[in-house]
């Protein structure tokens, strides 16, 4: 049994390649079933976003699993495997597990620490569960990944610092006002940066948003996104009297807000602070207004410096999270090892019960006078002896399975109890059953492939 992660993302493939390999939401159920029915596949999850398309699979063989995962992508999207292979990254076992944990924690995202990907990982897993294409391994692995992602965001500062210019302005405003609840926002210009900043302010509780733009239609369109109002530049002084926050990005060649009209507006504000964000180049707001009492002015360089500082802080937090991920990988591997010991336990029980059964047959032949009741009593007590003798070894072998050197210890356990023959027969039976299942178009048991491999 092997865990494989195969796919591409914004780091490995340009957008013109990524856009050809995106699963639409309505396609995913069918895609999951088709991937699961591919040879070697035992479990699967598909994670498809604007920045990544990744297949996570549990396969009974590494080589076969890799090949048929790539073949599935090529066939599904009608592309040549040779064309897409250079952009694919394939991770196996520990590396695949680590990658999933990093993705869920936001460490593999374009913006380190972003939280949206955690929800996308969770939804991908839940859909795979609904389509019944996950099993023992992925039910545990993805639950751990989602739980780890939540813990990372709640116990570290990875997602608390602004790493975009638009959101950095919001964070600065919170330091001045505490909250944007009840605050009035004035937007000068209807460009993308103004729109993004306005969205953040609106999401943080701004009471009203007014938009001024040279082109009235653009002002109306942007204002409508926030149930706001479009105003003309002729009303600028009045708007400055009312606004608590000013965002400016007009593209004008001269100052739109001068020290004079700002000073005039401030006289009528009765000491209310004015927070101004100038994200235009060249600047829209006369930097001299920062000398006026109760005016807080920040330009694009101020915001960019904050963003760069915050990015460095996020990288420091990412190092802490790396340690958390390593511990989580160890926990998952310990759990996974306990699955590998199941065939060993089964073989030992079967061997012991076979000995007990043979002994009972011998007793019945040699003591034919025993009553049916006597035989039942003897059978019960000899089975009890077997169970008591096995209790400690079976408890210990489960503990051994969770230790780092489990492979050597379990091999020794198998040798001591001479279980090689039983396990070989069990593995052959499983392999024969799996092959027959593929021929008949059936799914093999999710427990297949979990036999101890040495």
Swiss-Prot record:
The record marks 99 as: Important for activity. It comes from the Bacteria. PROSITE patterns: GLUTR (PS00747). The active site is at residue 50. GO terms for biological process: protoporphyrinogen IX biosynthetic process from glutamate. NADP(+) binds at residues 189-194. It is an enzyme of class 1 (oxidoreductase). InterPro entries: 4pyrrol_synth_GluRdtase, 4pyrrol_synth_GluRdtase_dimer, 4pyrrol_synth_GluRdtase_N, GluRdtase_CS, GluRdtase_dimer_dom_sf, GluRdtase_N_sf, NAD(P)-bd_dom_sf, Shikm_DH/Glu-tRNA_Rdtase. Homodimer. Belongs to the glutamyl-tRNA reductase family. PANTHER family: GLUTAMYL-TRNA REDUCTASE (PTHR43013:SF1). This is Glutamyl-tRNA reductase. It comes from Shouchella clausii (strain KSM-K16).
């Amino acid at each position: 049994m092997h865990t494989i992660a195969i796919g591409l993302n914004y780091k490995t493939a340009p957008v013109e390649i990524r856009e050809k390999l995106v699963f639409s939401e309505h396609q995913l159920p069918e895609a999951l079933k088709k991937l699961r029915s591919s040879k070697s596949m035992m479990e699967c999850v598909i994670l498809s976003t604007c920045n990544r398309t990744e297949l996570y699979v549990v396969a009974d063989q590494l080589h076969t699993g890799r090949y048929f995962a790539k073949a599935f992508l090529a066939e599904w999207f009608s592309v040549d495997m040779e064309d897409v292979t250079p952009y694919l990254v394939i991770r196996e076992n520990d590396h695949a597990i680590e990658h999933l944990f990093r993705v869920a924690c936001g460490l593999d995202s374009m913006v380190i620490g972003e939280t949206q990907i955690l929800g996308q990982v969770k939804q991908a897993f839940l859909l795979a569960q609904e389509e019944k294409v996950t099993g023992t391994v992925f039910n545990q692995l993805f639950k751990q990944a989602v739980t780890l992602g939540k813990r990372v965001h709640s116990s570290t500062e990875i997602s608390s610092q602004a790493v975009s210019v638009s959101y950095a302005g919001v964070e600065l405003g919170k330091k001045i006002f505490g909250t944007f609840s009840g605050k009035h926002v004035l937007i000068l210009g209807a460009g993308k940066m103004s729109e993004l900043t306005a969205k953040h302010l609106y999401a943080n509780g701004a009471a009203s948003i007014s938009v001024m733009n040279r082109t009235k239609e653009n002002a109306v369109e942007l204002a409508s996104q926030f149930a706001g109002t479009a105003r003309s530049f002729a009303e600028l002084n009045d708007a400055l009297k009312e606004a608590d926050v000013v965002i400016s990005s007009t593209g004008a060649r001269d100052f739109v807000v001068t020290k004079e009209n700002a000073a005039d507006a401030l006289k009528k504000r009765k000491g209310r602070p004015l927070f101004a964000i100038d994200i235009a180049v060249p600047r829209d707001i006369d930097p001299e207004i920062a000398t006026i009492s109760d005016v807080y002015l920040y330009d694009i360089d101020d915001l960019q410096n904050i963003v760069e500082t915050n990015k460095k802080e996020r990288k420091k937090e990412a190092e802490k999270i790396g340690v958390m991920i390593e511990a989580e990988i160890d926990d998952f591997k310990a759990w996974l090892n306990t699955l590998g010991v199941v065939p060993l336990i089964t073989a030992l029980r079967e061997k012991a019960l076979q000995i007990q059964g043979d002994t009972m047959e011998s007793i019945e032949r040699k003591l034919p006078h025993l009553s049916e009741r006597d035989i039942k009593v003897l059978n019960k007590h000899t089975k009890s002896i077997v169970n008591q003798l096995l209790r400690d070894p079976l408890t210990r072998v489960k503990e051994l399975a969770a230790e780092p050197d489990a492979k050597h210890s379990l091999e020794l356990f198998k040798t001591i109890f001479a279980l090689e023959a039983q396990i070989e027969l069990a593995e052959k039976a499983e392999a024969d059953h799996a092959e027959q299942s593929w021929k008949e178009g059936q799914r093999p048991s999710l427990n297949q492939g979990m036999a101890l491999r040495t």
